[in-house]
């Protein structure tokens, strides 16, 4: 059996996801304790470390909270990471380390002995339980490589679809914690096929699928998966994601990729996603302002929530891309109803200068997103009109050509019927593809049109 690999990450997912700076400033109204209580398990710890690494204002508070949480687990590796990262804020406790090391060693010996006993008894369920317990222990101490091996090995001892579903979720959980989604698609698909998939499991899979697509910058797919996540079950898997996260991820990805009709139908008017938006009123107002072409207000909301989004362990690296796409869409939609626009007024609407706006518009024109030309002297933007005369002529020629081809085909068929001519295909020729031979088809057509021209009575 092939063992699957997981990337080694000695500092948890938080280290690989860091912005590598500590300069993000955030409003004093932000309550870290309220925010972090939306999460549980290692997700909570990794988020605290990420926030401490990237926000000087919250550094001390976040490291202290992370230390308190990690001491509820047997993960010494993560404990050491937090101490080292704190740069003297926290002190190492040698007694705690020694005691926990002994405890972990005894627990590992016991679990390995249980597995060996189960294997010697050759009882499938016992082996699966033992492998799963060992994998769970490795997961808790931060040994993700061995945890993955154990979870994969339970596959050979699964006797029901529920067992398979549990195995899939264990592997998916590892992927989310390490932010390594290599195995996510196959195990999400396998889990979705389970006849025992309940509503909670289905919601969990949708949200994880959303994270997988977000990580791969497939923003439209990510938006769809988050929007499809049932609201009633969204607060029961806080070890992965919070309902507020689903609102932010789904809403921003939708703004960046959905057209107006999709935004109205699948986000604004969707009864299920409305519940998520109620949890984040500013996001709800932002989306409504965008749809109602109140771009100045929309952009102000985006600027206000940006510091919080940059402290999100999954979203931070996509914020600039999503913001740029949303802004570009707003510029295109603002200009689309007009033949010309005063760029001074447009710059005011988008909280920018005419010089910067001109650069943005130039880029959109180069990318063929806006059909327009810029009058730099008068600071006006003019819609580029298509040559209606040429377009009409080309359409007329195409319609005439289509009509001629259709008429010739009809007349040919009528003449063949009048002369009792039919085509019989040879099965072997068909299998070889001779019926598609262009030379054969052209020769036959030439003969038929010759017959048509000689006997034409029309």
UniProtKB/Swiss-Prot annotation:
Keywords: Cytoplasm, Nucleus, Signalosome. Residues 1-10 have a biased composition (Basic and acidic residues). It is found in: Cytoplasm; Nucleus. Signal peptide: none annotated. It comes from the Eukaryota. Residues 1-25 are annotated as: Disordered. Residues 13-25 have a biased composition (Low complexity). SMART domains: PINT. Residues 218-388 form the PCI domain. SUPFAM superfamilies: Winged helix' DNA-binding domain. One of its GO terms (cellular component) is cytoplasm. Pfam families: CSN1_C, PCI, RPN7. Belongs to the CSN1 family. The PCI domain is necessary and sufficient for the interactions with other CSN subunits of the complex. Component of the CSN complex. The holocomplex is comprised of 8 subunits csn1-8. In the complex, it probably interacts directly with csn2 and csn5. Essential component of the COP9 signalosome complex (CSN), a complex involved in various cellular and developmental processes. The CSN complex is an essential regulator of the ubiquitin (Ubl) conjugation pathway by mediating the deneddylation of the cullin subunits of E3 ligase complexes, leading to modify the Ubl ligase activity. This is COP9 signalosome complex subunit 1. It comes from Dictyostelium discoideum (Social amoeba). The gene is csn1.
């Amino acid at each position: 059996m092939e063992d699957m690999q997981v990337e080694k990450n000695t500092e948890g997912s938080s280290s690989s996801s860091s912005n590598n700076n500590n300069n993000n400033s955030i409003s004093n109204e932000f309550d870290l304790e309220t925010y972090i209580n939306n999460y549980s398990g290692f997700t909570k710890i990794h988020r605290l470390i990420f926030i401490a690494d990237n926000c000087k204002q919250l550094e001390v508070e976040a490291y202290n909270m992370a230390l308190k949480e990690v001491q509820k687990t047997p993960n010494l590796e993560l404990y050491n990471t937090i101490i080292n990262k704190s740069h003297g804020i926290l002190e190492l406790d040698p007694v705690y380390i020694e005691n926990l090391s002994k405890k972990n060693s005894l627990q590992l010996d016991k679990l390995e002995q249980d597995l060996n006993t189960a294997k010697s008894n050759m009882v499938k369920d016992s082996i699966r339980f033992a492998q799963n317990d060992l994998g769970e222990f490795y997961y808790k101490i931060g040994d993700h490589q061995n945890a993955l091996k154990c979870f994969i090995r339970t596959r050979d001892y699964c006797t029901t679809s529920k067992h398979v579903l549990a195995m899939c979720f264990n592997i998916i959980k590892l992927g989310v914690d390490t932010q390594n989604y290599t195995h996510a698609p196959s195990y999400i698909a396998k889990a979705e096929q389970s006849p025992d998939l309940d509503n909670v499991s289905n919601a969990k899979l949708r949200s994880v699928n959303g994270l997988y697509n977000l990580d791969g910058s497939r923003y439209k797919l990510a938006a769809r998966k988050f929007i499809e996540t049932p609201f009633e079950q969204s607060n029961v898997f806080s070890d992965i994601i919070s309902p507020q996260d689903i609102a932010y991820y789904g809403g921003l990805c939708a703004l960046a990729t959905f057209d107006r009709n999709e935004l109205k139908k699948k986000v604004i008017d969707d009864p299920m996603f409305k519940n998520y938006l109620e949890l984040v009123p500013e996001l709800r107002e932002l989306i409504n302002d965008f749809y109602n072409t109140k771009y100045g207000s929309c952009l102000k909301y985006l600027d206000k929530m940006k510091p919080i989004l940059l402290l999100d362990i999954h979203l931070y690296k996509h914020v600039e891309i999503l913001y740029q796409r949303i802004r570009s869409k707003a510029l295109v939609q603002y200009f689309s109803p007009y033949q010309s626009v005063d760029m001074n007024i447009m710059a005011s609407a988008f909280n920018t200068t005419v010089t910067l706006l001109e650069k943005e518009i130039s880029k959109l024109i180069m990318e063929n997103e806006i059909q327009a030309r810029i009058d730099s002297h008068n600071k006006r933007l003019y819609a580029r009109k298509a040559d209606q005369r040429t377009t009409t002529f080309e359409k007329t020629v195409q319609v005439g050509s289509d009509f001629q081809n259709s008429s010739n085909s009809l007349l040919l068929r009528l003449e063949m019927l009048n002369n009792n001519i039919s085509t019989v295909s040879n099965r072997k020729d068909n299998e070889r593809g001779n019926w598609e031979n262009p030379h054969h088809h052209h020769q036959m057509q030439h003969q038929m049109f010759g017959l048509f021209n000689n006997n034409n009575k029309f």
